[in-house]
From Swiss-Prot:
InterPro entries according to UniProt: GEBP (IPR007592), GeBP-like_C (IPR053933), GeBP-like_DBD (IPR053932)
Lineage start: Eukaryota, Viridiplantae, Streptophyta, Embryophyta, Tracheophyta
Alphabetical list of PANTHER family matching this protein: BNAANNG10740D PROTEIN-RELATED, DNA-BINDING STOREKEEPER PROTEIN TRANSCRIPTIONAL REGULATOR-LIKE PROTEIN
Signal peptide (UniProt feature, chain positions): none
Source domain of life: Eukaryota
Entry's Gene Ontology BP terms: regulation of DNA-templated transcription
Name listed for the protein in its UniProt record: Probable transcription factor At1g11510
Keyword check for Hydrolase: no
């Protein structure tokens, strides 16, 4: 029994004709590729061929050779380098743009500063005159030498007459002053110098003269002492003036008190005498004295009005006698104090 052919178990062997067909097809495809490659050469190959052909040229074509060499270098360059070069160019452009913006900002700042400076100069030009006028107006007229001249003039005039005469002093010093001084200006300066001297005296402690930083102040102080007296004399004169004011005020208060206490004074309301010969103290100084002790006036008047007429007369006589003795006591007291103050003033004057 013959075996049946199974194509899966025993595949048929390829025939020679089939192999030849495959070989032919392979060859034809390779030929086609060669034709395509020959028809479309790559740019790199074309450039290299052109460069190689140009190298075999004559010496007259050296310029074209160098250009081709540059093209060759450009073509052969790595694409990564090209990208980097582009980035560098971009950064250079951005840097140039940034520097241009910085330059423009600097120029604008310079322009603003120039405008500001010009504006300040214009303000100075426009307002400078006023400031100079103010400085000139408040400029010191009296120099230090002028002050010494004035004090020396006072001393010289006082030596001749014993008393300073401002009219003579003005005629004496006006030609030596550094400016055209008027008499009013001289009088104001004299008052200012005296006030300054008194202020310096106030700085003295225990009779010790104050210290000065500037030699001019020391010299002016020494000359002022010759004009208005030394420290002790000034203190004595100040004490005299204070004593006079105190004495005058004290005498005024004593006078007022005595006038109010005397029965016949103008400030005192006379004691009323009743028709029956009785005395009334309702408006007398006795009522005011009682009020001074703390009792109100109405209570004092009512209390005195309730006294018997005999007591009223006795109190009236005693009150008048005490007022007379009080007046004598005040006179003795103030005479004594005046004598003491006079001796103190003489003691200060002799030690000056």
């Amino acid at each position: 029994m013959s075996r049946r052919f199974n194509p899966l178990e025993d595949p048929p062997s390829a025939s020679s004709s089939d192999e030849e067909g495959k070989e032919i097809a392979r060859n034809s495809s390779s030929d086609d590729e060669d034709d395509v490659s020959s028809e479309n050469p790559s740019p790199l190959k074309t450039t290299l061929d052109a460069v190689s052909d140009s190298e075999s040229g004559s010496d007259e074509e050296t310029d074209s050779d160098s250009e081709l060499e540059k093209k060759k270098d450009q073509v052969v360059t790595n694409p990564v380098d090209v990208k980097r070069a582009k980035k560098v160019k971009t950064s250079e452009k951005s840097g140039a743009k940034r520097s241009l913006e910085v330059d423009e900002a600097a120029v604008s700042m310079d322009v603003k500063r120039a405008k500001k400076v010009s504006g300040e100069e214009e303000k100075k030009k426009s307002g400078g005159g006023g400031e100079e006028t103010k400085k000139t107006y408040f400029q010191r007229l009296w120099t230090e030498d002028d002050e010494i001249v004035v004090l020396q003039g006072l001393i010289d005039d006082k030596k001749d007459t014993g008393v300073s005469n401002t009219n003579k002093v003005y005629e004496l010093v006006k030609k030596s002053i550094s400016f055209d001084v008027s008499k009013n200006q001289l009088m104001e300066k004299l008052r200012a110098l005296k006030k300054k001297y008194e202020n310096n005296l106030g700085k003295a402690k225990d009779g010790v003269e104050p210290t000065f930083v500037k030699p001019h102040d020391r010299k002016a102080f020494e000359l002022s002492k010759l004009v208005w007296g030394g420290i002790r004399m000034a203190l004595a004169s100040g004490m005299k003036s204070n004593e006079k004011s105190k004495k005058s005020s004290k005498f005024e208060s004593v006078k007022h008190e005595l006038d109010s206490s005397l029965p016949n004074s103008k400030n005192n309301c006379e004691d009323e005498v009743m028709d029956e010969g009785e005395v009334s103290f309702t408006k007398s100084s006795l009522v005011r004295s009682i009020v001074g002790l703390g009792m109100d006036e109405l209570t004092a008047q009512q209390g005195l009005s309730k006294l018997a007429s005999k007591d009223m007369k006795r109190f009236y006589e005693q009150w008048k006698a005490m007022q007379a003795r009080e007046f004598e006591f005040f006179l003795q007291k103030h005479g004594f104090l005046f004598e003491v103050l006079s001796k103190i003033s003489e003691a200060f004057g002799s030690n000056a």
